[in-house]
């Protein structure tokens, strides 16, 4: 059994995660809709893959039964989180996504009791919306060319609707 599946593994962030997983000695199961892109990626890293639409419940459940957890990287998450989270609850697999979309955060929080009953964790925002942090890192790297490491700390100063 592979330890986790990356759905959307060939997208920008998914592909970065796959590369880092390989560096760390992990062998994730790659997944997504586009079989051609998956095949190329799988051959590059010597990994297995499963091609299926997130709306194909049988294929989704079958792939999840091969792993312990899912790292969901296929957005826009407003169109994909529910199918994946419901499949994780059905198959008792942990769920982590890289979304920064509040609708998904709220919807997954509403599924908390179902997740607990299945003995799993639903964790949206595992990457704290990667675009802002990527932009910050790129900006800092240009300003501090000799730097070799960067640590980011984030503090919330309240919330609400921005206007």
Label each PLM-derived region with a short phrase.
Residues 3, 27-29, 48, 149:
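Residues at the starts of beta-strands that form the adenosine-phosphate
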Residues 99-121:
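Rossmann-fold NAD(P)-binding glycine/threonine-rich loop
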Residues 36-107:
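NAD(P)H-binding glycine-rich loop region in Rossmannoid oxidoreductase-like domains
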Residues 30, 72, 96-97, 122-124:
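Hydrophobic residues in well-ordered beta-strands that form the structural core
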Residues 24, 45, 90-91, 118, ...:
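Helix C-cap/helix->beta junction micro-motif
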Residues 26-37:
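Conserved glycine-rich Rossmann-like NAD(P)H-binding loop of the short-chain dehydrogenase/reductase
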Residues 127-129, 135-163:
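Conserved anion/nucleotide-ligand pocket segment
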Residues 4-24:
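N-terminal Rossmann NAD(P)H-binding glycine-rich loop of SDR-like oxidoreductase domains
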């Amino acid at each position: 059994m592979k330890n986790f599946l990356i759905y959307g593994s060939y997208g920008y962030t998914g592909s970065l995660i796959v590369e880092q997983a390989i560096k760390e000695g992990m062998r994730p199961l790659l997944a997504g809709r586009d079989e051609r892109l998956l095949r190329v990626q799988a051959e590059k890293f010597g990994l297995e893959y499963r091609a299926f639409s997130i709306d194909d419940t049988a294929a989704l459940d079958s792939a999840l039964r091969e792993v312990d957890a899912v790292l969901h990287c296929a957005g826009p998450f407003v169109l994909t989180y529910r199918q994946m989270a419901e499949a994780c609850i059905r198959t008792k697999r942990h769920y982590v996504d890289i979304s920064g979309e509040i609708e998904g955060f709220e919807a997954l929080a509403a599924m908390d009791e179902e997740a607990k009953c299945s003995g799993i964790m639903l964790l949206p925002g595992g990457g704290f919306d990667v675009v802002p942090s990527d932009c910050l890192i790129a900006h800092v790297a240009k300003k501090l060319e000799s730097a070799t490491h960067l640590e980011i700390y984030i503090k919330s100063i309240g919330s609400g609707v921005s206007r």
